[in-house]
Amino acid sequence: MNNNSFHEYNFNSEYLNKICCNKSYVCYMGQHFSPCALQENSSTWKRHAEESSSENDKGNVWNFQNLSNVQHPYSFSDDGNHSLDPANALERKKACELSTSCLSTMKYPWMRETHAPTHFSSINAMESGDSKYSNGEAVVRNSSSKRARVAFTSSQLLELEKEFHFSAYLCRNRRLEMAELLKLTDRQIKIWFQNRRMKYKKDHKEKSTAKSSYTYLGTENQPLIISRSTTDSPVPLKFQNNYETPSMNW
């Protein structure tokens, strides 16, 4: 009977020792490996783990009176602080402040928003007969989606000016010939001639306005307005439509 009680006592004591050691290890590790304390260097973690494991291997047993005062690593005391010594609490507080400042200033790749400019080729789609644009749907245009301007060479401009001198309007066949000759597209030549005609009309209108001048002669009763010839210069032949009138034999 005594042997059984002795074995039971040894078993219970060994079991209690393991429980106490494990509990002390958990409490010790919990204090130093809390979420705030994880911000410190790995050498401190290894040192604490080795010290705690060496103490457990030696068979050190905590006093049960001390275990009664041990609190959960994440439990809070009345004043709102963890049940740790002031040095560890100060270190943990500094680590928390450091981690908070680092996380607040750190920018991850997913936080950087990149807006790629959207390019729309609506004109090309309309020319190709795309159903989306042929139905008359509204197209949102961006400032960056404007068509690039074509820089004509001096030889191309010379040929275009010579052709404009003979005729301000070109038929489609002549435009295709010019496009093949100057290595341009039919659309580019068509737009160039449109702009050139508008420029010519604007210059012609300014010249005709400058020719018409008025002279005001001031008198006591009423001013006398004398105007010079305000007749516009005749329209150039290339802007006129020449139609052959049939001769009438009487």
Swiss-Prot record:
Q: Does the keyword Transferase apply?
A: no
A Gene Ontology biological process noted in the UniProt record is: anterior/posterior pattern specification
Q: Which UniProt keywords apply?
A: Developmental protein, DNA-binding, Homeobox, Nucleus
One of the entry's Gene Ontology molecular-function terms is: RNA polymerase II cis-regulatory region sequence-specific DNA binding
Known DNA-binding region: 145-204
Pfam families hit by this protein: Homeodomain
What positions does the record give for the motif labelled Antp-type hexapeptide? Answer: 107-112
Report the main location listed first in the record: nucleus
- InterPro entries xref list: HD, HD_metazoa, Homeobox_CS, Homeodomain-like_sf
What PROSITE patterns does the record point to?
HOMEOBOX_1, HOMEOBOX_2
RNA-binding among keywords? no
Q: Name one GO cellular component term.
A: nucleus
Q: Which SUPFAM superfamilies does the entry mention?
A: Homeodomain-like (SSF46689)
Q: Where in the cell is it found?
A: Nucleus
> What's this chain's function?
Sequence-specific transcription factor which is part of a developmental regulatory system that provides cells with specific positional identities on the anterior-posterior axis.
Q: Say which family it is in.
A: Belongs to the Antp homeobox family.
Question: What is the name attached to this protein's record?
Answer: Homeobox protein Hox-C3a
User: What is the species listed in this Swiss-Prot or TrEMBL entry?
Assistant: Danio rerio (Zebrafish)
Q: What is the taxonomic lineage of the source species?
A: Eukaryota, Metazoa, Chordata, Craniata, Vertebrata
